[in-house]
Design a protein with these regions (language model features):
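ER/secretory pathway lumenal C-terminal domains and tails of membrane proteins involved
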Residues: 1-163, 170-241, 246, 252-308
């Protein structure tokens, strides 16, 4: 497989999942066509464009999916189009239909962004130069990451956050789409009424997006993570500069937040064992932090520095 052009399947533990996305035989080595099929259907469509369309067209729900038609797909809010792609959405259980992550934008942000791309490209040589810069930002923070990561199927969580930079770039094009609409009306010397209607339409887009996404992004009165970290820190001994060992992100971030932001128990030393195998983290732990001394590590830097 590694000798073929542009191999994308590399993890033998994911062989069954690869086959599910590429349509290959269960006990056969993947072909060039199957590699490209996997790249297009999973890595591009499912793990990038699906996230992109969540943000600018609409989202079915916030249930993590594995390709099934009822979980985590993009939708438009236009019934006949969504039903054509995913089946009759009215047949979904209420728990999915009323999911807070069910957000519909009717594709309006996408259309404005495409208009912005067209407007920028048609503004002469300078517009094309500006487009190339913005497109490079869009590509390198989106599709280039897809190419580099070469992800296996069955990721432990949705990965849309990895491509936020490209979504920001497209949001710039959305703004240009509004400018393009104004420029078009200015050139046609449109009357005040059409201009006003167009501005209301453009204003409707962010209002619709905010109204749809507010309930699933509202963090009001959510203190579980904060309280979790504070409780851990406050139960440690008051004296002696205690050390708390933790493992992984969810164990660690509530502790860091409480110390760094709310200044809770800054005499406690937090040690994340997931990082303990790295030279930079060992050095950090040897240094004092806030009111806590460094960890009593007797090695000097030459003994654990990578490459020495």
């Amino acid at each position: 497989t590694q000798n073929m052009l542009f191999p994308r399947m590399w993890n033998d533990r994911s062989a069954a999942s690869y086959k599910g996305w590429s349509g290959g035989g269960a006990n056969e080595a993947p072909t060039q066509k199957e590699n490209l099929t996997y790249f297009i259907t999973y890595q591009l469509n499912y793990m990038y464009w699906r996230y992109f369309l969540w943000n600018f067209v609409g989202r079915q729900n916030d249930i993590q999916g594995s390709g099934e038609p009822e979980h985590g797909n993009w939708i438009t809010g236009i019934s006949w189009l969504d039903n054509l792609r995913l089946g009759d959405q009215k047949l979904l259980p209420e728990s999915l239909r009323e999911n807070k992550g069910h957000n519909v934008f009717y594709g309006l942000p996408l259309l404005l962004g495409l208009l912005g791309i067209y407007w920028q490209w048609t503004r002469g040589k300078k517009g094309k130069q500006q487009f190339s810069v913005l497109f490079f930002l869009f590509f390198m923070t989106g599709l280039a990451i897809v190419l580099y990561l070469n992800q296996t199927p069955g990721q432990p969580r949705e990965r849309d956050y990895a491509y936020a930079g490209s979504f920001y770039a497209f949001a710039i094009w959305i703004g240009m789409g509004v400018a393009g609409c104004c420029d078009m009306l200015r050139r046609k010397q449109a009357k005040i009424l059409p201009v006003g209607l167009l501005m209301l339409l453009c204003l409707f887009v962010p209002i619709q997006m905010a109204s749809q996404t507010w309930d699933d992004h509202d963090r009001s009165n959510r203190y579980t993570c904060r309280d979790f970290g504070a409780n851990y820190l406050m139960t440690l001994p008051d004296k002696g500069n205690p050390i708390i060992f933790c493992n992984g992100d969810n164990d660690t971030f509530p502790l860091w937040y409480n110390q760094d932001t709310e200044e809770v128990r800054r005499d406690v030393r937090i040690c994340n064992l997931s990082y303990a195998q790295t030279d930079w983290y060992i050095y950090q732990q040897q240094c004092p932090l806030y009111d806590a001394p460094g960890l009593p590590i007797s090695w000097d830097q030459n003994q654990y520095q990578e490459g020495k």
